[in-house]
A protein has these predicted regions:
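Phosphate-binding/switch loop-helix module in NTP-utilizing enzymes
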Residues: 42-84
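N-terminal phosphate/diphosphate-binding loop that engages ATP/GTP or pyrophosphate donors
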Residues: 1-52
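C-terminal lobe/tail of nucleotide-utilizing enzymes
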Residues: 119-184
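Inter-motif core of Ras-like GTPase G domains
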Residues: 85-108
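Histidine-anchored nucleotide/phosphate-binding helix
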Residues: 88-95, 113-124
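Short, structured coil segments at secondary-structure junctions
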Residues: 26, 97, 154-156
Length: 184
């Protein structure tokens, strides 16, 4: 997670909950800074944020991690076209690094349009869309199965798995919900 908003000050420094989960579940012993080199205390990065978005730091960190591991998974930050404080989209860095993409779709009202636009944007940016994951964030969503079917028919990449609605999902083992055999 090279960049994270909604961080909190802790006794160990500024930390992000998702990055801490990634650090704890990494197959390699990595420092927090290797997992999350750029942090922001605000809800989002914005034009007036004091944190500097340095793509060089992100790229250097990616190279360092790639030298240590067979596979590096880079978690996104806020969506494909989210703007960083220098008003460049996060996707610009992903394109610069030519990273393949797995799209995570929060299954909720309006997600079909958002997911299809995001998938098309990733493809238009010239990156491979390796697959997508359905993340059920609303347990009461009507027509859940129909929504998944509509996305499967329209996203030009395989469904890698469905994460059911789970309270405290970050505290649970989720790997068994995914089939990443097509990615290996």
């Amino acid at each position: 997670k090279p960049i994270a908003a909604r961080c909190q000050e802790t006794s160990e420094g500024i930390r992000n909950k998702d990055a801490l989960v990634l650090q704890a579940t990494s197959t390699l012993p990595l420092s927090y800074e290797e997992i999350n080199p750029i942090t922001c205390l605000d809800e989002v990065f914005h034009a007036h944020a004091t944190e500097d978005i340095n793509y060089g730091v992100m790229s250097s960190g990616l190279r360092d991690l790639s030298a240590k591991a067979d596979t590096v998974v880079v978690e996104g930050s806020g969506g494909w076209r989210v703007l960083m404080n220098d008003l460049r989209p996060y996707a610009e860095w992903v394109v610069q690094e030519q990273l393949p993409v797995v799209l995570v779709v929060g299954i909720k009202l309006g997600c079909v349009s958002h997911a299809l636009l995001t998938a098309q944007s990733i493809i238009n940016d010239g990156l491979p869309l390796l697959g997508w994951v359905a993340n059920r964030i609303n347990p009461g969503l009507a027509h859940y199965a129909e929504t998944i079917a509509a996305l499967q028919q329209r996203i030009p990449a395989p469904l890698l798995g469905e994460i059911p609605y789970l309270p405290r999902a970050e505290q649970r083992e989720l790997a068994h919900y995914l089939d990443i055999s097509t990615l290996l």
